[in-house]
Swiss-Prot record:
InterPro entries: ALG2, Glyco_trans_1, Glyco_trans_4-like_N
Species per Swiss-Prot/TrEMBL record: Homo sapiens
Gene3D superfamilies: Glycogen Phosphorylase B (3.40.50.2000)
Function of the protein: Mannosyltransferase that operates in the biosynthetic pathway of dolichol-linked oligosaccharides, the glycan precursors employed in protein asparagine (N)-glycosylation. The assembly of dolichol-linked oligosaccharides begins on the cytosolic side of the endoplasmic reticulum membrane and finishes in its lumen. The sequential addition of sugars to dolichol pyrophosphate produces dolichol-linked oligosaccharides containing fourteen sugars, including two GlcNAcs, nine mannoses and three glucoses.
Domain of life: Eukaryota
Family (UniProt): Belongs to the glycosyltransferase group 1 family. Glycosyltransferase 4 subfamily.
UniProt cross-references to Pfam families, sorted A to Z: Glyco_transf_4 (PF13439), Glycos_transf_1 (PF00534)
Predominant subcellular localization, coarse grouping: endoplasmic reticulum
Bilayer topology: Single-pass membrane protein
Keywords: Congenital disorder of glycosylation, Congenital myasthenic syndrome, Disease variant, Endoplasmic reticulum, Glycosyltransferase, Membrane, Transferase, Transmembrane, Transmembrane helix
Enzyme class: transferase
Protein name as it appears in the record: Alpha-1,3/1,6-mannosyltransferase ALG2
EC numbers, comma separated: 2.4.1.132, 2.4.1.257
Subcellular localization: Endoplasmic reticulum membrane
């Protein structure tokens, strides 16, 4: 009987799912999109990813396992110097991409999964055959920009309205954390009747298990025992300066012998097309020089998956510096690699990190961060204890299996 039910379940046609994403680079949003696509593909769904920009040389390796199509990359990403008008350009690129997919690409699909930019959702209402739409909200976009002038407020007003209105047009809305769910309800007043479900990002543990860590001789100077690691994009909101300031504080807390064995690697996503990446990288280098940290810090830009796994395998702890991070995949990666995390005590890390068990949650100031780092130097066995607890937590709460089943259930429910 059970076998017959299993055969019946397998014989049910699997949905065809199309993912629409603005820029398939190397950020947390891209990591989630890839994991979601791979998860549905593993469940037998037909999956394709359409994006406005895709560079096989600047992407996650798993993207090469999926059919990725690109349209609209010729459209501008900004209006002039300094990345002005980026929001309008992102909306135009995504609307064009949706129109292209719907009317020129000859694609057949049952469900479209989009994220980051909701402006494309109304386009799919134009389809002859009704398409079901799942929108994954990483965080309300209107909260990710400043409005420090009248012109900026005037510019953002229609964009913010479009975001809220079109987000409400989705058939299913998912968010990445309880923190984001609360912010969603607080921000989108007209959508107060909608309770978005939380689908935590998972970790693609297969890629971590299959990689053999390589030696870090070319990245870490000889004689360094305490390797600190920061993984984040070169963006000011990621507060990478906190890691450098904590290092300065740490220098005053350690003996000269221990200090000489400390090294920080600042590894982050870096795209030369993004002005902020270029500027902030130079700002951080200048700060290192001014703080006399040159021989204690290595900057790594756009590193490979193998390098990242090797760094996580070898480091003493990870410094996760952004405040109010929407979720944050880096703490999961670190914990799975049995590496404790020191993170700011706000946002997603409050849900992923178990304080004093898998890492430390601290106030976003260099003194508290340096105190937490010092604990690992004074008590080396702490890394192993917290590392084991961290891996167990990831397996229990953020497994790929749980993510796959939950996502597949949301997709199939749309077609009932």
């Amino acid at each position: 009987m059970a076998e017959e039910q299993g055969r019946e379940r397998d014989s049910v046609p699997k949905p065809s799912v199309l993912f629409l994403h603005p820029d398939l680079g190397v950020g947390g949003a891209e990591r989630l999109v890839l994991d979601a696509a791979l998860a549905l593909q593993a469940r037998g769904c037909s999956v394709k990813i359409w994006t406005a920009h895709y560079d096989p040389g600047h992407c996650f390796a798993e993207s090469r396992e999926l059919p990725v199509r690109c349209a609209g990359d010729w459209l501008p990403r900004g209006l002039g110097w300094g990345g002005r008008g980026a929001a309008v350009c992102a909306y135009v690129r995504m609307v064009f991409l949706a129109l292209y997919v719907l009317f020129l690409a000859d694609e057949e699909f049952d469900v479209v999964v989009c994220d980051q930019v909701s402006a494309c959702i109304p386009v799919f209402r134009l389809a002859r055959r009704r398409k079901k739409i799942l929108f994954y909200c990483h965080f309300p976009d209107l909260l990710l920009t400043k409005r420090d002038s009248f012109l900026k407020r005037l510019y953002r007003a229609p964009i913010d309205w479009i975001e809220e209105y079109t987000t409400g047009m989705a058939d299913c809305i998912l968010v990445n954390s309880q923190f984001t769910a609360a912010v969603f309800k607080e921000t989108f007043k007209s959508l107060s009747h909608i309770d978005p479900d939380v689908l935590y990002p998972s970790l693609n543990v297969t890629s971590f298990d299959s990689v053999v860590p390589e030696k870090l001789d070319d990245l870490v100077p000889k004689g360094k025992k305490f390797l600190l690691l920061s993984i984040n994009r070169y963006e000011r909101k990621k507060n990478l300066t906190l890691a450098l300031e904590a290092l300065v504080q740490l220098r005053g807390r350690l003996t000269s012998q221990d200090w000489e064995r400390v090294h920080l690697i600042v590894a982050g996503g870096y795209d030369e097309r993004v002005l902020e990446n270029v500027e902030h990288y130079q700002e951080l280098k200048k700060m290192v020089q001014q703080s006399d940290l040159g021989q204690y810090v290595t900057f790594l830009r756009s590193f490979s998956d193998k390098q990242k796994i090797s760094l996580l395998h070898s480091c003493t702890c990870v410094l996760y510096t952004p405040s109010n991070e929407h979720f944050g995949i880096v703490p999961l990666e670190a914990m799975y690699m049995q590496c404790p995390v020191i993170a700011v005590n706000s946002g997603g890390p409050l849900e992923s990190i178990d304080h004093s068990v898998t890492g430390f949650l601290c106030e976003p100031d260099p003194v508290h961060f340096s105190e937490a780092i010092e604990k690992f130097i004074r008590e080396p066995s702490l890394k192993a204890t917290m590392g084991l607890a961290g891996r167990a937590r990831v397996k229990e709460k953020f497994s790929p299996e749980a993510f796959t089943e939950q996502l597949y259930r949301y997709v199939t429910k749309l077609l009932v």
